[in-house]
Amino acid sequence: MGATIKTDVVIVGAGPTGLSLACQLVRHGVGFVVVEKNEGVTPYSKAIGVHARTLEIYEQLGLAREAVERGTVAGKVRLLSGGEVRGEFDLSEVGEGLSPYPYVLMLEQSKNERLLYGYLKSHGRDVLWNTALESFSQTEEGVTAFVKTADGESQTVEARYLVGCDGAKSPVRHALGLAFEGSTFERTFYVADAQVDWRFAHDALTVSLSKETFVVFFPLKGERRYRVVGVFPEEFAKDEGEVLYEEIEARVKAEAEIDLDIHDVEWFSTYKVHTRHVESFAAGRCFLAGDAAHIHSPAGAQGMNTGIQDAYNLAWKLALVLKGSAAEGLLDTYNEERLENAKNLLRTTDRMFQLAAGPEWLLSFVRTNVFPAVAGYLFSLDSVKRFVFPLVSQIGINYRHGSLSRHEGDGDFKVKAGDRMPYFKVEGESVYDRLRGPKFHLLGFTDERGAVRMSDAGAEGKYADLVDCQTLPLSGQAAEAFGTDGPFQVLLRPDNYVGHISAGASTGGWEAYLDDLCRPSGR
């Protein structure tokens, strides 16, 4: 048996969620060990949609630009029915003014994993590949994990906390005995990555709508390269592993009703769609994140992005507790915030999926006749864009009802405690450029520089290590984003969600917030 490894956090699983958590812990200066049963990052494309909120998180890691360069922006949506184009609408700037990344990026899971793994390697960290979790136990003081390497050597990892990022069949979840309730869509889905030759330019996410269902062609990096996704009919009786590629190709051609040639298939698979969430994201000193905690329909490409946000939410809380800057009760808010988000996500994706794939005659009529006719007009309206983009891109996720959101002073603002910090520019640059440090951010907005003197209350004293204080000009964009033209202060959590907001220069609100949440230096 090898020597015992001692660390702060043991992460089980090195998919997008586990790697994201590891990267965030690097930012926060927290020790960790990642164990992964596979030999390296996935070679398969798997998930492909990367949304604005994920790119904003990547930006803090210095990875956003490279992600965009490696992927393909979905410039528009093309709607087909009966083999003919029924409508088109632009997607290239659908979220303009709402995020630095106002689009949907097509970037395969394999490339996301390589990006994140590259970040770890560049910071001198690695993953224990070919290492499987065999069992674990926990006490009030910590967690002990027993793992086995590819050569059969057993090893012990002792940590303060364990996080299961080990997928939909999560051994960690099973060992914790946590229920994973939900439902299964009975029809079988298919997916293939291939070259598609047809009359259309490689510039759009193309959706072919039919009476029974749909076929979607997602443009990927590379000439005429697409991800093709669709559904077999209800009477299709084969098990997932028995389906031949030729059956998928025949189905695509039958549903699309257009002349096309599919070749150079890189990967294909079939699967059933499940919608489930765990009863709790936490049990003692163990946590679940990503597919280990929630799975849902592929509608809206939410899965990988949601797991990355799970990791982002948990990392800063673990860091504060492990460094002695907050009580362990802070970790309870991970389950509070992310379980509620998972429930909302499942409801939303289920509705989207039912509209896209439901066989009922009314849905069929709407899918093939009504939606293609009105979609272009609807998505030309700013009001629709400002509703749909935050919903799909995940920038609209909020924690307004959580215990970390203090609403005493936010009544007069458009932005509420629990909301993501809105995007706008300050002196020509993204406000997010000022918020990259892994700290709380106390921002004073004023039309007279220096009028809001936050340091007077001791932020540069007892909270000096935890809070970054800045005074920013109250520009037109800032005033519009927050809905006020008078001086105000906003305290952002380390994940850039609003904890507290108040008018004027009073220090009482945000200082009381930090007093409740943190343990100031010297206490």
Model-derived regions: residue spans:
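Helical substrate-recognition/capping region of FAD-dependent monooxygenase/halogenase enzymes
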Residues: 2-8, 12, 28, 81-84, ...
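Residue-level detector of alpha-helix initiation sites
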Residues: 15-16, 41, 167
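Conserved FAD-binding catalytic core of PHBH/FMO-like flavoproteins
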Residues: 69, 85, 118, 161, ...
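Active-site-adjacent segment of FAD-dependent monooxygenases/related oxidoreductases
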Residues: 43-46, 50-121
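Core beta-strand elements of the Rossmann-like FAD/NAD(P) dinucleotide-binding domain
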Residues: 5-7, 151-161
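N-terminal Rossmann-like FAD-binding beta1-loop-alpha1 element of flavoenzymes
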Residues: 7-34
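FAD/FMN-dependent oxidoreductases across multiple families
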Residues: 70, 241-306, 326, 331, ...
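A conserved short coil-to-beta-strand element within the FAD-binding core of flavoproteins
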Residues: 129-143
